[in-house]
Regions:
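Basic, helix-initiating cap at the start of DNA-binding domains
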Residues: 1-37, 44, 48
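Amphipathic alpha-helical packing segments from all-alpha helical-bundle domains
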Residues: 125-153, 159-162, 206
């Protein structure tokens, strides 16, 4: 059955209208991701959330993955704004900063889900131009993150601080799915013999950040 188009979501004619429509689509995606895994959300489902057709959504985003990439940028920026307040004030122990970083991310499940899907889902089925725009914004955001960390760990060089953010993203991509087990995996790992198979994301991610930071500091 075709989706019904409604006048409330008319085609944007001016740049500010177009941006408003894009933000409305991102808002809808964010709401859906609070209840559904990303793989269950299609452009058609986004259209239903807004009471418009899939065609309307495609006018503003080329693919579902394009929507998620843009939402990842928006979520990451909001996190960085909050992180500047959530990290301990300098001077502080490096391990405190890493633990706060991990805890702050763990509290933002939609952001973690999107970030973990980056290489295998979000960067597929999009144009080279979309990927270029995303990666330039990602670099800008990680540079800002590196600055926040260097403010608290001044012994870290500028280059190593950016390297830390690169390793942090790769670690999140690998670790987050293990911290969201299916019911069958959760039941199996409830066995006391498999205690070490259970992943507590903020704890393990914090340890990864601390270990990586220690290695970078040791080599500098």
């Amino acid at each position: 059955m075709d989706d019904v188009e409604v006048p409330a979501f008319q085609r944007a004619r001016r740049p500010e209208q177009r941006e408003l429509r894009r933000q409305e689509i991102l808002d809808a995606a964010e709401l859906l991701l609070a209840d559904l895994p990303a793989e269950e959300i299609s452009l058609r489902e986004l259209g239903r959330q807004l009471n418009v057709s899939k065609t309307h959504v495609v006018r503003y985003f080329e693919t579902r993955e394009g929507v998620f990439l843009e939402l990842l940028n928006r979520q990451r920026l909001a996190w960085l704004d909050a992180l500047s307040e959530e990290l301990p004030e300098p001077p502080c122990e490096p391990e405190q900063a890493m633990a706060a970083w991990a805890g702050s991310l763990a509290a933002r499940q939609v952001l973690c889900q999107l970030w973990s899907l980056l290489p295998n889902v979000l960067e597929r089925n999009v144009s080279a131009e979309t990927v270029l725009v995303y990666k330039l914004i990602d670099l800008e955001h990680r540079t800002r993150l590196a600055t926040l960390i260097r403010d608290r760990v001044p012994a870290l060089t500028e280059d190593d601080a950016l390297t830390l953010t690169e390793y942090a993203v790769v670690s999140l991509v690998g670790l987050w799915p293990f911290s969201c087990p299916t019911p069958a995996i959760a039941e199996a790992t409830a066995d006391p013999r498999l205690e070490r198979a259970r992943v507590d994301f903020p704890v393990m991610y914090g340890e990864i950040l601390k270990t990586t930071l220690a290695g970078l500091l040791a080599r500098s």
